[in-house]
């Protein structure tokens, strides 16, 4: 009998029913909810006279719309639409009795940071959320992916989800990473290799020595961007780092339940004879600090490279490349490390954790933000913010000239007051560089927190290794 992948094992453990055409009904262990994709779902429950099937497994937190400045719990400081959505989530959480972390709660933050922090995300689970970056939770050996609003309602009502099984892809990062190379460089390099459609129809398992060497924060960064490579989900087999991270979290099992869970978690790995539909192998030593130059995450190159010419691409990509160059205001042949920036944003569900802030602080300590540059650091949760202040990181940021914000999605997306102006160029640690993603006409370059910190000092895209 052929062995199973980690994805196969979790799928089989949660399969409630499978039709002849492969359409399956999966049980869902955790349902994460935020203010943007949930209002219609809760209203659907009301109209049908239904309750939430498993309120103890449903967790809500406002993150996308909330301002990151003081006084943000006052609706007057939000846009009208944002205030309505946050108020709706507050009411729905109370009406339906689900777990809720309001803006006033220190535990509030980005949903994909709050879930792991509070121990809601555990190995072997199925986790869904009405948000495309739910794959973040795959770092724990969980099957986690985004769902649409109609599916949000379905999970609220039944704690199940209808779907078809994906294929298995293995992405192996062998060997060691060089100094200055991070998890963000891994995940962007993978997307640059496979393209944004390379993972379509697959669940990606990331493995190899370089992946195992990553902290849990680093693994979350890698899995977070699986969707940018087209995959349904990204996943990493749990190990001692995973178990240590989960132990003692507020909603992790305790005592005998912990021991029983741990015994099962240790079986969650891909068998040696498991079948892979696709395999991608990249040597860790070949990965360099990278930045994006265009308007797709696959438009990524080492910081030592030059802006590519549109005619260096093939087929239909020539037109797309030229459109990217025009939108980004770039000229082919320009060294990437000579591109001047206006703004630096460090945060998001990709890079808003304590390790990310430490990395940025290590570059910024004793230095100043370039004159005329706008720079902000937005912790991924209130607890991350408190820890950064306790460790003295916040003082480093403020002394350098960064704005020290409250937790939220912030400038990752233009759904709150933190936005770029037309033509404004940003070095960002977020996950998407689409046209208008950070604000209409805004120009986004994706990179690691350390690279963004380096850019803040020099005022241009910079090889962080020069400042280490």
Swiss-Prot record:
It catalyses: (2R,3S)-3-isopropylmalate = (2S)-2-isopropylmalate. Its cofactor is [4Fe-4S] cluster. Keywords: 4Fe-4S, Amino-acid biosynthesis, Branched-chain amino acid biosynthesis, Iron, Iron-sulfur, Leucine biosynthesis, Lyase, Metal-binding. Binds 1 [4Fe-4S] cluster per subunit. Pathway: Amino-acid biosynthesis; L-leucine biosynthesis; L-leucine from 3-methyl-2-oxobutanoate: step 2/4. [4Fe-4S] cluster binds at residues 349, 409, 412. One of its GO terms (molecular function) is 4 iron, 4 sulfur cluster binding. Its EC number is 4.2.1.33. InterPro entries: 3-IsopropMal_deHydase_lsu (IPR004430), Acnase/IPM_dHydase_lsu_aba_1/3 (IPR015931), Acoase/IPM_deHydtase_lsu_aba (IPR001030), Aconitase_4Fe-4S_BS (IPR018136), Aconitase_4Fe-4S_dom (IPR036008), IPM_dehydratase_rel_enz (IPR050067), IPMI_cat (IPR033941). Gene3D superfamilies: Aconitase, domain 3. One of its GO terms (biological process) is L-leucine biosynthetic process. Catalyzes the isomerization between 2-isopropylmalate and 3-isopropylmalate, via the formation of 2-isopropylmaleate. Belongs to the aconitase/IPM isomerase family. LeuC type 1 subfamily. Heterodimer of LeuC and LeuD. This is 3-isopropylmalate dehydratase large subunit. It comes from Jannaschia sp. (strain CCS1).
């Amino acid at each position: 009998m052929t062995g199973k992948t980690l994805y196969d094992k979790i799928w089989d453990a949660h399969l409630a029913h499978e039709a002849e055409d492969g359409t399956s009904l999966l049980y869902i262990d955790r349902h994460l909810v935020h203010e943007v994709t949930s209002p219609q779902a809760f209203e659907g429950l009301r109209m049908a006279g239904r309750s939430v099937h498993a309120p103890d497994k449903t967790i809500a937190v406002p993150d996308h719309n909330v301002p990151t400045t003081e006084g943000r719990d006052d609706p007057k400081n939000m846009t009208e639409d944002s205030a309505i959505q946050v108020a709706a989530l507050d009411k729905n959480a109370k009406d339906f009795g689900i777990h809720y972390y309001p803006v006033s709660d220190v535990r509030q933050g980005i949903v994909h940071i709050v879930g792991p922090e509070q121990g809601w995300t555990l190995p072997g689970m199925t986790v869904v959320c009405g948000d495309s970056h739910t794959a973040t939770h795959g770092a724990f050996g969980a099957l986690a992916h985004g769902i649409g609003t109609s599916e949000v309602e379905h999970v609220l009502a039944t704690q199940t989800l209808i779907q078809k099984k994906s294929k298995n892809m293995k992405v192996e990062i062998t060997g060691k990473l060089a100094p200055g190379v991070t998890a963000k460089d891994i995940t962007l390099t993978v997307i640059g290799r496979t393209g944004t459609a390379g993972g379509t129809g697959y669940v990606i398992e990331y493995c190899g020595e370089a992946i195992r060497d990553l902290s849990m924060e680093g693994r979350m960064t890698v899995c977070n961007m699986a969707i940018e490579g087209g995959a349904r989900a990204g996943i990493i087999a749990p190990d001692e780092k995973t178990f240590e991270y989960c132990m003692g979290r507020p909603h992790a099992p305790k005592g005998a339940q912990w021991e029983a869970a741990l015994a099962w978690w240790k079986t969650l790995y891909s068998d040696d004879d498991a079948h892979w539909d696709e395999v991608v192998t990249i040597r860790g030593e070949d990965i360099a600090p990278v930045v994006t130059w265009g308007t797709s995450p696959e438009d990524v190159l080492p910081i030592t490279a030059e802006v590519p010419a549109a005619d260096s691409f093939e087929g239909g990509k020539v037109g797309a490349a030229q459109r990217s160059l025009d939108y980004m205001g770039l000229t082919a042949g320009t060294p990437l490390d000579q591109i001047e920036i206006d703004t630096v944003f460090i945060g998001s569900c990709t890079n808003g954790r304590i390790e990310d802030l430490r990395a940025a602080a290590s570059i910024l300590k004793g230095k100043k933000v370039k004159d005329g540059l706008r720079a902000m650091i937005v912790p991924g949760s209130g607890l991350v913010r408190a820890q950064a202040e306790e460790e003295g990181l916040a003082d480093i940021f403020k002394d350098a000239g960064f704005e020290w914000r409250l937790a939220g999605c912030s400038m990752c997306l233009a759904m709150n007051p933190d936005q770029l102006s037309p033509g404004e160029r940003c070095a960002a640690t977020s996950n998407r560089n689409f046209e208008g993603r950070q604000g209409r006409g805004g120009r986004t370059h994706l990179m690691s927190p350390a690279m963004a910190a380096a850019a803040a000092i020099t005022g241009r895209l910079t090889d962080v290794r020069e400042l280490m």
